UniProtKB/Swiss-Prot annotation:
Topology of this chain in the membrane: Multi-pass membrane protein
Superkingdom assignment: Bacteria
Organism expressing this protein natively: Burkholderia vietnamiensis (strain G4 / LMG 22486)
Matching Pfam families: Glycos_transf_4, MraY_sig1
Cell location: Cell inner membrane
Record's keyword terms, sorted: Cell cycle, Cell division, Cell inner membrane, Cell membrane, Cell shape, Cell wall biogenesis/degradation, Magnesium, Membrane, Metal-binding, Peptidoglycan synthesis, Transferase, Transmembrane, Transmembrane helix
Family indicated by similarity: Belongs to the glycosyltransferase 4 family. MraY subfamily.
CDD domains tied to this protein: GT_MraY
InterPro entries noted in UniProt: Glycosyl_transferase_4 (IPR000715), PNAcMuramoyl-5peptid_Trfase (IPR003524), PNAcMuramoyl-5peptid_Trfase_CS (IPR018480)
Protein name: Phospho-N-acetylmuramoyl-pentapeptide-transferase
Group of enzyme by EC: transferase
A single GO BP: cell division
EC numbers for this chain: 2.7.8.13
Gene Ontology molecular-function annotations: metal ion binding; phospho-N-acetylmuramoyl-pentapeptide-transferase activity; UDP-N-acetylmuramoyl-L-alanyl-D-glutamyl-meso-2,6-diaminopimelyl-D-alanyl-D-alanine:undecaprenyl-phosphate transferase activity
Amino acid sequence: MLLALAQWLQGDASFLRLFTYLTFRAVMATITALGIGLVCGPWVIRKLTQMKVGQAVRKDGPQSHLVKSGTPTMGGVLILIGIAVATLLWGDLTNRFIWIVMLVTFGFGVIGWVDDYRKVVHKDPRGMSSREKYFWQSVIGLFAAVYLAFSVSEANNVRVLDLFMAWVRSGLSMGLPARADLMLPFLKSISYPLGVWGFIVLTYFVIVGASNAVNLTDGLDGLVIMPVVLVGASLGVFAYVMGSSVYSKYLLFPHIPGAGELLIFCSAMGGAGLAFLWYNTHPAQVFMGDVGALALGGALGTVAVIVRQEIVLFIMGGIFVAETLSVMLQVSWFKYTKKRYGEGRRLLKMAPLHHHFELSGWKETQVVVRFWIITLMLCLFGLSTLKLR
């Protein structure tokens, strides 16, 4: 919004050219989202407390968690408010990637909000059924996947539509330009052509998978938000590189026109996340809830797809991957041993993985900070792929 205003008034006030610089707007988006979160945080927490949306705590989990019962949840709305305001203020609202990422983020946020609302307001411990939740996630994920298959491949919406119609006329069998290929880290001249169907399937699993992986990780005070901020910031760097014809050529990456604007969104997400951490750090005053976790995971997945860094997301989000695998392995092993031996057995003391470490004697803050450190190292490793190719 401010970019459009600056471009309109630029002839009358030359200092407004500052607003056209992507890096300046990214910094301001961070500050704006951070400020909104810090200022509005107490009001949001107070309103959530008045709504009596207290978090229910598992009685079979670590005993130290029982004191958290009643802490207001659904605090992810604070993050979404910061992201929305900062992105709309400092982003280029004519950029198609901004809108598709916002659509996925807030679409998944609505799903999470409904799930949380049913759990804590209607006192329905099931919330949305898994089938219902995955259905709506799939609707949003597939829509985004189809759009991005053609949007990543072309420079503007007119050419996106032309490419889509050409695909339809080809009997749904046409391939995609090279910039839509799956990029392999550390290999500068090797990529894997996905085709339209391969792109759609991969994108669907990345977006929906990332959303649910972040949601599973959200189990301790401050645990998930810092990895989200770190991974989001790293993806913002990739977006800046991919969106620049100069840097992308120098670093041997495909140039994706318009992708650089995602730096604004990632910066807003980082600022909003840090503001939320102010109130979510141990002992937490508010929990994120599904409204925040599903939204942020979907956002990370969508940005990673646009900048063609799906594999790098898998690396940088290693904590999310480990948490998800721990649940899958725990459930699978329990079912297998119950069928084989007549009683279910566990691989871990408790899943997701962070609870296993708690029950192994780690304090909650130790688990959280160590997971942060691991994520920081993984993000630095992921960023090294910019040059080590």
